[in-house]
């Protein structure tokens, strides 16, 4: 058969057929009948188009050999025979210029006279059978179907045969000749029987061997075979009564579907108890910075040098005293730790050459604060498995805490603009493709909206602290290293600025596993008097360490400076996530981008510029007891960023659980709002799953209270 095909058909057609088969991973040497069928189909498409032109008056004419200079346009565009990408490009371009509906499958030809796509079929079976299969497959009124058989029969949509009698007769004669040539070589019977119907992918997909055995093993209960399960799934009416479906599925399931109405949901129950306390790894809105502008001192960029320079900008140090003790801690130790930091910084300055890092003396106060020698001694299991009363520590249930107003204030502050820029516009190479141009434009607009945002300051501060702490934990495992908490920014005028927030002292850090803990003591400057919201500072011992002159509208006022000291801990995995906080920028940019995409698809053009530059338009930001809060696009960017940053700063198991479970209730409620008549079963169980995550975490409690505002708003 292969030899016959190569002799019988034009070499160009043979080459196109080989290419088409290779594209689908088929071998012309093996699947010879298919090879012949593809060549035949290609030849019919070319003959269909041959000699048919449209003249200057848009009339259809037949020219077999004439003036090559006549202004003639081919009547048919040949799509069959091109590679897929090119073929779709041609189809798209035809649809765009003529307004014809885009077909779901690649057709064979386009008729410029009748303005329609044509599907050509060549069959070795009954033309009616083949016609119906084609029509069922393409399911389009718009594509014209024309079927030829090797016996001289034909069939076309609405009996409209498109071409004149003579052109069609040429095609039929050629097909008859091919059939006779095959028959004379004894190839026809095999060729005729090899034709299969138009298949859809699912019908062709046969599972055999191991996969078949796995499929049979993994069926739901009560199904004997894959066929039996398939038949059941095919007959499953999606909009029927759900209870019936559930009972069909399994004998054990007896869920009653309850309609979810406006009166169904209740607000989430937030826990009672003392107000929740601050648990972030560093101070947020309460932080105070000692800064130097245009740093140009020797060793600029070395953290310890920068820190000493920043400390020198302040002259109001005084004898420290405790103003808010830590309930459970040995407070004098915190006081001694700060005094030790001051003394050791003074020692560094008295040295000839300032070292690049500073390891603190292992004093009793630091050993206590860093939990040195506090870990219970580890004993090999072999040595103690015979102890009769061996048991795990009883661990106390976490104490419930109520929502406090400070966390909403923290969030509001994170959304605000500062007077410094915390990120530079990345230098990325020239845009090459149009999509890159749009991407750069979006990135630049977004960066402009968030570069001065306080949440961005928290990102850079978090990245710096976590990077420094992880470095020190690996490089100086046994040392109590002093790590300055530093950030860098640019002022409105574009001048560089280095800021010092305070110090961290790291404990022993032999971190083998991702979750092994390194303890640290943080000491951070602040102007916030802890006595105003003592519950927020439950975990801190707060000292008063100096007075600062502040310029105000009424002149200079002196305000006390506080030092917030606490023992804390982190792990390699937490530091890794802290170092990657810049991802929050990407996450919020993607959320904004999906808003732009939605807007663009409605308007059918890229709306990036309008989106950011139309200052009059307001967008929904969130729900509050007052209703839907709206704001400018910049405010939306900053709010989304702040949410992403707080998810990182306050990451916890409670947040994971709350986010996953409350999302289900959120989707049901949105379905109710959109009048989709949702139904639920075991709603009580869902509430239980959500509320078991509401224990004492400030960020989770705030999100739960926002969720209640959203519920109230939807159910109005």
UniProtKB/Swiss-Prot annotation:
Extent of motif Nuclear localization signal 2 (NLS2): 184-247
EC class (word): hydrolase
UniProt keyword Oxidoreductase, yes or no: no
Gene Ontology cellular component list: host cell cytoplasm; host cell nucleus
Motif Nuclear localization signal 1 (NLS1) mapped to chain: 124-139
Cofactor needs: Mn(2+)
Binding site for Mn(2+) 1: 41, 108, 119-120
One example GO MF annotation: endonuclease activity
Chief place of localization: host cell
Annotated compartments: Host cytoplasm; Host nucleus
Chain positions recorded as Mn(2+) 2 binding sites: 80, 108
Subunit structure as annotated in this protein's UniProt entry: Influenza RNA polymerase is composed of three subunits: PB1, PB2 and PA. Interacts (via C-terminus) with PB1 (via N-terminus).
Family according to the record: Belongs to the influenza viruses PA family.
This protein's name: Polymerase acidic protein
Organism: Influenza A virus (strain A/Goose/Guangxi/345/2005 H5N1 genotype G)
Lineage, opening ranks: Viruses, Riboviria, Orthornavirae, Negarnaviricota, Polyploviricotina
